């Protein structure tokens, strides 16, 4: 299990979607712990919460699901020279 923080990019799969509609707990197996929005946090968000570009999703789930969640947020995980994951915009 890992905890990740990914910003929601404009026009990504998460931009404008509800948590319920995304079913992140099924694929890629992540539970959204909180959403950082406008300087504040929405803790333990419910399924009706709609995500928007600029939100930051804080979620826990399997290490192998990170790349898929990043892609759904509009990012690609790329390993840098030190072996750390770095977010690069898709497209």
Regions found by a protein language model. Name each.
Residues 1-3:
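Interdomain regulatory linker/hinge segments that flank or connect interaction modules
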Residues 5-73, 80-81:
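Cytosolic Rossmann-like ligand/nucleotide-binding regulatory domains
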Residues 77-91:
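Short peripheral tails and domain-boundary helices/loops at the edges of structured domains
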């Amino acid at each position: 299990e890992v905890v990740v923080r990914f910003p929601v990019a404009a026009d990504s799969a998460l931009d404008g979607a509800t948590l319920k509609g995304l079913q992140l707990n099924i694929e890629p197996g992540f539970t959204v712990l909180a959403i950082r929005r406008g300087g504040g946090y929405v803790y333990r968000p419910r399924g009706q919460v709609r995500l928007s570009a600029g939100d930051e999703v804080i979620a826990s789930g399997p290490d192998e699901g990170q790349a898929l969640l990043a892609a759904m947020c509009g990012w690609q995980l790329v390993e840098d020279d030190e072996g750390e994951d770095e977010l690069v915009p898709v497209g």
